[in-house]
Regions:
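A solvent-exposed, charged loop/short amphipathic helix patch at secondary-structure junctions
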Residues: 216-243
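Structured beta-strand-rich core segments of catalytic domains in phosphoester-bond hydrolases
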Residues: 66-87, 104, 115, 124-221
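Active site of divalent-metal-dependent phosphoester/diester hydrolases
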Residues: 25-35, 150-166, 238-272, 277-307
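Stable alpha-helical elements in mature extracytoplasmic
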Residues: 109-113, 136, 140, 250-257, ...
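Residue-level marker for buried hydrophobic side chains located in beta-strands
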Residues: 92-93, 126, 273
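Membrane-embedded alpha-helical segments of integral membrane proteins
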Residues: 3-55
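Transmembrane alpha-helices and immediately adjacent membrane-cytoplasm interface residues
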Residues: 41-84
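Active-site-proximal beta-strand elements of phosphoester/diester hydrolases
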Residues: 89-101, 198-207, 236-243
């Protein structure tokens, strides 16, 4: 019975770890199963411990499971030996600043988000949801411009739409909005002259999950086990359906950006792509974008990228 359970967990790990191969447009209900991948890893580790005490010769089952899922595990939670940064490396910061939380601290000089960006000393900064006053009453943009000679703002012309900001220490030759279907989210491309090399920088804010405060509260109640069986099932179906629908809208956005980027990669133009994907590392969105690129977090980061 235990062995059968371990095999089932391993098969689920393989399926969920590769869930990004399924397009959410066709399989919306599967789109967010990747969120459960770490839970399956924990279950498999528990089996590893159990076999150590009960039947040592069976320990290779969970070990094989980890080996078969090496790719998804490394994508979700990479581990790398720390190394010195290479000569000539540049520092890039991507940050969804959520309007700089200016309602809690309207003074840019005291705003912790602005302070963090300045102190990061990043060479290139890509900001999402970077709404600030255009007349500079909050002094946010002017404060950032003091530290970055090149400032680009792209505003989507729709009520409540996104502000995308690029801060750069390198010259910005042009900026371009990457068109895809979204009422508020957007992706913006910039061509930068980085030490004499034209480099494409892409700042993304893919479709938000759009969970209401009621949805979030319902999820918390669900996790705490405070709902009756019928209500818990209804709440689960509601959340899975809603997240699946959003994933189906996000998929073609990622495909559009991937096609845009590939045009420049085919011309041997270096590409730096970052942003708020609103999705998990094992998602179709991430897989589509990363197909032609190197994931810097996987290559040099450590642990799960929790934010």
């Amino acid at each position: 019975m235990l062995l059968a359970g371990n095999i089932i967990v391993i098969l689920m790990m393989l399926f969920v770890g590769n869930i990004g191969r399924f397009n959410p447009v066709d399989y919306p209900l599967l789109a967010n199963l990747g969120l459960g991948f770490p839970i399956l890893l924990v279950f498999n580790f528990v089996f590893l411990v159990v076999w150590c005490f009960l039947r040592l010769r069976t320990i290779w089952f969970p070990l094989l499971g980890f080996l078969l899922c090496y790719g998804p595990i490394r994508t979700y939670s990479p581990f790398n030996i720390p190394e010195d940064k290479p000569h000539g490396a540049i520092k890039v910061l991507s940050y969804n600043v959520f309007m700089f939380s200016s309602w809690s601290e309207p003074d840019a000089k005291k705003n912790p988000i602005v302070d963090y960006i300045v102190k990061s000393k990043a060479d290139i900064v890509c900001l999402q949801e970077a709404q600030a006053t255009l007349d500079d009453k909050d002094h946010i943009y002017s404060t950032l411009k003091k530290h970055y000679p090149y400032f680009k703002l792209m505003i989507k012309k729709a009520p409540g739409a996104d502000y995308m900001v690029l801060l750069s220490k390198y010259p910005v030759l042009w900026q371009d909005s990457i068109p895809y279907g979204s009422s508020s989210n957007q992706s913006v491309a910039y061509m930068l002259d980085i030490k004499g090399t034209n480099t494409l920088v892409v700042n993304n804010h893919f479709e938000s999950n759009g969970l209401s405060s009621g949805d979030k509260e319902g999820f918390k109640t669900l996790v705490k086990g405070e709902l009756k069986t019928g209500e818990a099932k209804r709440q689960s179906v509601h959340l899975i359906t809603k997240l699946g629908d959003v994933s189906a809208r996000r998929a073609p956005q990622a495909e559009t950006v991937a096609r845009y980027v590939k045009k420049y990669l085919d011309k041997k133009v270096p590409v730096i792509l970052c942003g708020d994907f609103n999705d998990s590392p094992l998602s179709y969105t991430h897989r589509t974008i990363a197909k032609e690129l190197n994931d810097c977090f996987v290559e040099s980061g450590n642990g799960p990228g929790i934010s």
